[in-house]
Amino acid sequence: DPPFSPRL
């Protein structure tokens, strides 16, 4: 996963 990947 990338540094910032908000999984909703």
From Swiss-Prot:
<feature type="modified residue" description="Leucine amide">
    <location>
        <position position="8"/>
    </location>
</feature>
<keyword id="KW-0964">Secreted</keyword>
<comment type="function">
    <text>Myoactive.</text>
</comment>
<keyword id="KW-0027">Amidation</keyword>
<protein>
    <recommendedName>
        <fullName>Pyrokinin-3</fullName>
    </recommendedName>
</protein>
<dbReference type="GO" id="GO:0007218">
    <property type="term" value="P:neuropeptide signaling pathway"/>
</dbReference>
<dbReference type="GO" id="GO:0005576">
    <property type="term" value="C:extracellular region"/>
</dbReference>
<keyword id="KW-0527">Neuropeptide</keyword>
<comment type="similarity">
    <text>Belongs to the pyrokinin family.</text>
</comment>
